[in-house]
Amino acid sequence: MILDDIKSYNKQFEYEPLVENVGKLKKFKKFVVCGMGGSHLAADILKAWHPELDIIVWSNYGLPPLGEKELKERLVILSSYSGGTEETIDAFNTAKARRLPMAVIAAHGKLISLAEKNKVPYVQLPDFHQQPRMATGLSLMATLALMGERTWMAEAKTLAIHLRPSREEHRGKDLAKHLHDSVPVIYASARNAAIAYNWKIKFNETGKIPAFQNVVPELNHNEMTGFDTKTKTHSLSRHFHFVFLKDGADDPRIIKRMSVMEKLFKDRGFKVEVIFLQGKSEIHKIFNSLILADWTAFHTAKLYGTDPQEVPMVEEFKKLIARER
């Protein structure tokens, strides 16, 4: 259950991934991670944690439109917690047809079978029957193992000790109450875009409510003007409630922009919640925030009387897609 997943989140970083067919895995400096939904969140976070890493996150059919030479210089990592994601299986088949170096991350399903059949390196995640969005720690450890980043794995392992999920529940419950009967809009710096996106999808999937996200400074040049409300447009935006993810490590100019935005929004009658990203390290800071997001989304679901675990609309959509073939 999702409650247990949140409470034991730190234990995911005790995970020691086993790479099967490891003899076929070479060392790469460039990567493409193909995954949908919760299965690409670990790669997103990895980009935020180590911006210098050359990694393309691809959430679509096939592969990114790169030249053949460029693709052959990258390890293509196919990530699907269920192992049955249509787009990721298509990416596997595309990579196989083009004879590209690849590896697989999945808990079970067709993707594992394909990896075994084709002798492709793979990590089979432990199946705790959790939603993919709740297995980001496991996916991160598996991704780092395939990349051969042992130093980063060792740093991530410290989260098993430093993360204290239960300590964040009270804050999450309070934030859910403040955000009740509104649509959260999460803003962060561009370098923390992955954190803002995680907050958004947790509100969507766990909380079962609309939520949106964007980044500074880009939104200062467009989206922000949509909230310069007038009498005739007030009804369109009165349900939005802003969540600013502030990071002391951000560029001082970004910090200034967020402070000015906070004033502008409050002057126009909008509610703004400010969350300061804190932690003993960059990765600790990221996951501290994500656990707070989990608790907030969980208690949001409770306030609305919805199931925080399942995603019935996604499952219904998949069935309809399959029926149309």
Which residues does each predicted region cover?
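Active-site phosphate/pyrophosphate-binding segments
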Residues: 2-5, 11, 22-23, 29-30, ...
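Short helix-capping/linker segments at secondary-structure and domain boundaries
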Residues: 18, 146-155, 207-208, 297-310
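Glycine-rich phosphate-binding loops that contact phosphosugars or nucleotide phosphates
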Residues: 22-166, 177-178, 247-252, 259-267
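Structural alpha-beta junctions
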Residues: 52-54, 205-212, 263-272
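Conserved beta-strand scaffold positions in the cores of enzyme catalytic domains, especially
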Residues: 55-57, 122-124, 211-213, 242-244, ...
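Short acidic loop-to-helix transition motifs that present clustered carboxylates
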Residues: 59-66, 218-221, 279-282
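C-terminal active-site/capping subdomain that shapes the small-molecule cofactor and substrate pocket
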Residues: 228-314
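Short, small/acidic-rich helices and loops at N termini and domain boundaries
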Residues: 309-325
